[in-house]
From Swiss-Prot:
Lineage: Eukaryota, Metazoa, Chordata, Craniata, Vertebrata
Cellular component aspect of the GO annotation: anchoring junction; cytoplasm; cytoskeleton; protein-containing complex; sarcolemma; synapse
Calmodulin-binding as annotated region, ranges: 517-537
Protein name according to UniProt: Beta-1-syntrophin
Chain positions found as N-acetylalanine: 2
Domain PH span(s) in chain numbering: 18-297, 321-432
Subunit structure and binding partners: Monomer and homodimer. Interacts with the viral HTLV-1 TAX protein and other members of the syntrophin family: SNTA1 and SNTB2. Interacts with the dystrophin protein DMD and related proteins DTNA and UTRN and with the sodium channel proteins SCN4A and SCN5A. Interacts with DTNB.
Localization terms from the record: Cell membrane, Sarcolemma; Cell junction; Cytoplasm, Cytoskeleton
PDZ domain sequence ranges: 111-194
Tissue specificity statement from the Swiss-Prot or TrEMBL entry: Ubiquitous. Expressed at high levels in the liver.
Modified residues (Phosphoserine): 86, 125, 204, 218, 225, 231, 235, 388
Amino acid sequence: MAVAAAAVAAPAGGGGARAQRSGLLEVLVRDRWHKVLVNLSEDALVLSCEEGAAAYNGIGAATNGSFCRGSGTGHPVPGVAQAPDSPAGVRTAFTDLPEQVPESISNQKRGVKVLKQELGGLGISIKGGKENKMPILISKIFKGLAADQTQALYVGDAILSVNGADLRDATHDEAVQALKRAGKEVLLEVKYMREATPYVKKGSPVSEIGWETPPPESPRLGGGSAEPLSSQSFSFHRDRKSIPLKMCYVTRNMTLADPENRQLEIHSPDAKHTVILRSKDSATAQAWFSAIHSNAGDLLTRVVADIREQLGKTGIAGSREIRHLGWLAEKVPGESEKQWKPALVVLTEKDLLIYDSMPRRKEAWFSPVHSYPLLATRLVHSGPGKGSPQAGMDLSFATRTGTKQGIETHLFRAEISRDLSHWTRSIVQGCHNSAELTAEITTACTYRNQECRLTIHYDNGFSISTEPQDGAFPKTIIQSPYEKLKMSSDDGIRMLYLDFGGKEGEIQLDLHSCPKPIVFIIHSFLSAKITRLGLVA
């Protein structure tokens, strides 16, 4: 049977068309591939392993009308208290049937005191968590242990708090830690949620996909929740995972070797989670990649607006406005097995900023992994290099920045040629705009054993003047326009050499530190002026 064809529709409201696609792919979970139904909307990707989904089959037949082996689609036979896969000493959703739970406690908050045992602890297993848009649920109660001895807890109970610490906004890991640290006497606030029973019966590969993308400055453990639990929109589809595409990194050939070119990867904004999907062939994989990448890219305008609202008038730093941002693959230095890594790159009016994940909180925007002034940065390579290009090198570009420590180089890879063009154009224009905005830079130097100042002006060129002494005005020793500069060089340590073709010959300036920033700034000024004059084709 052929793979379901992609359905493309334009969104309501007259905006640009975004791909909406549906079909069968495979997802990698715990080093095994599992068939899943994938639905792409304008802003999310939904993976599901549900009964009946095999009707859309395009990658092999399903088993017993379903796929995602291990999804727990079987149901207990009436009158049988225990399913075959439930250990005799464990209470599960197969043994604690919803109809056996008193109606009087359904959706009612209860306080239950549990005395931890030295062996076995509380004697429960939990599922759910904020990353799955679900409360923390008791999925198993071990018979004879502490929780079971209370005779007041049920499989399907949502744990609202532990010793007063609110778990309604907790991730799974946070809930585990809260229960571990709770001490010997534990007061649980719980509420039985009958609709959660299908979820806690048995997990599926899709339900094991971790994916947490909390909003900026979201409350963490103990922060409380403004909404009552019953009004929160939790999804109890145990075999469905919704992945918001906003600020996801959609790429290929990064995490896992893909010799057949059938895979695509979706990395979470916090860089903690990766979903790897595989198609039946290269062409189908490329079609899925293009659709998902396009939809994620269309959300960037909304992302920039959200960041501006979050940061307010201050901008990222010094009122610097975001001009462009997005994910790129960055080459890992050295001979590491991992050749590329995700990098969030942001261009402001004056800087190139690199983050290893999407900042969630306002203060995180002020702490990038790298921050480079565009004025001292240049684009030095774009597209395939000399000789046989390596995989991905045809969409790569490099930047070099002059710093006090020398030259720092970064090699990036875009996903499509349009992205490559946009990034390279944005960086070059950013360098030129920064040159015009800055207009002039001044640095201390020593010239012929005299303390001086070197000034480089965007329009007027170079000047060397003496340091003012005892209130006297500085004296200009040398002044020269860019047109007279015949050659410039440096020793990479502290000396800058300028030759204006005058009788004094080559001018030697001791900058007292690495000259690379000044060398790169001179290049930026010259490049911007040439471009402004229309001398670049």
